[in-house]
C-alpha cells in the first residue's frame, strides 16, 4: 500500500487564479491546471531564489518531492505559453499551516493541517489531544475547541 501524500505547506495564494491568452477566442482556449503547491514551488525557487533544500524545507517535503513538483509546474507553464492555453491555478494537496498534536492517552504524535479538524487520535481514538509544540495548545486549532479544559480535567482525575 502506498504511503499517504503529505500536505505541502504553502505561504502564498495569488489574487488572480486564471490567466488567458489575449485575443484568442474562448472556444479555442484549452486549460492547463496548475496546482497551488506547484505555483508555490516556482515562487520559492524562481522569485525568492532559494536553493532546492531551502525550498523543500519551507514546504515541509523532501528535496526529491520538491523537484518533482517544480518539474511538473514548469512543464505545465511551458505548454500553456507555447500552445496558447489558459492557466488555471487550483487544487492540489496543500495546507497553509501544519500542527503537531500529541495524544495524552497513547502518546502518539501526529500532524494535522488546519483545514482538517482532527480532534481524535488516529491511533487510539482518544479526544485527549494537545498541541505538541512546546507542550502548549495550538492557538489556532484549539481555540474554542475546549481542548485545554479537557486536558486539565484529565490531569485532575
From Swiss-Prot:
InterPro entries: RNA_pol_sigma_r3/r4-like, UPF0251. SUPFAM superfamilies: Sigma3 and sigma4 domains of RNA polymerase sigma factors. Signal peptide: none annotated. Pfam families: DUF134 (PF02001). Belongs to the UPF0251 family. HAMAP family: UPF0251 (MF_00674). This is UPF0251 protein CLD_3165. It comes from Clostridium botulinum (strain Okra / Type B1).
